[in-house]
Amino acid sequence: IILEESLGATFVESLGGTPVTPEIEKLKKQGWWFEQLYATGTRSVRGIEAVVTGFPPTPAQSTVKLSLAQRNFSTLAAILGQQGYESEFIYGGESHFDNMRSFFLANGFNRVTDENDYVSPVFRGSWGVSDEDLFNKTHERLVEKQKTGKPSFTLVFTSSNHAPFEFPDGRISLYEQPKNTDNNAVKYTDYALGKFVEKAKTSDYWKNTVFVVVADHDIRVRGDSLVPIERFHIPGLILGADIKPRVIKTVASQLDLPP
């Protein structure tokens, strides 16, 4: 599962957004594309909670931070672990943020890879290494896992599309000036995703891996007004060697991803 930071429908042209995700627009024609998928919240921890556990949002704090959820809490990793899967969380930043590391390792994940595990990254910013580095590490780990012959589950969480929107120069043609804006950062994240999928398709692990690309949430919603449903609209895509293109118009949420 590739959990894309803040990459909501706001940034996907075919979903009514700004045209800054050309790679996703290409990839959506190659797999299952969800046109009416919605996030459960407006923060990353809510996206993690929904995608990894299928648990609906709780008042005040996410289950990822609640003390009683720090062990024996049902997650995709725990469920797959019962079937012999090894699970890993890969992040480009500090994994202790939002209590992710503790929650994952206590609830089915066998390994956490974070900012400290990158040697000579291409770029390092306020939120850690770039999404290029993240995907290079993901590719490296998937190659290693393929060689073991054991089934595995990997959760990858991007971060380049997070304020202050820092990313390496020379990768994309900027959508706007100045450089460090959300639109440009999303375009870079999209670029990094496209490069990763391109590399994955030439690798042995492509033939037996299912890839799920989904946003954690759209851009932040503020104020005491009626909930703007359009601000919870996110893209969702399932890719794989044997997955035939399909457009799914059924209304769904992140809660529908895990069993």
Predicted regions and their residues:
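Solvent-exposed soluble domains appended to multi-pass membrane proteins
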Residues: 1-259
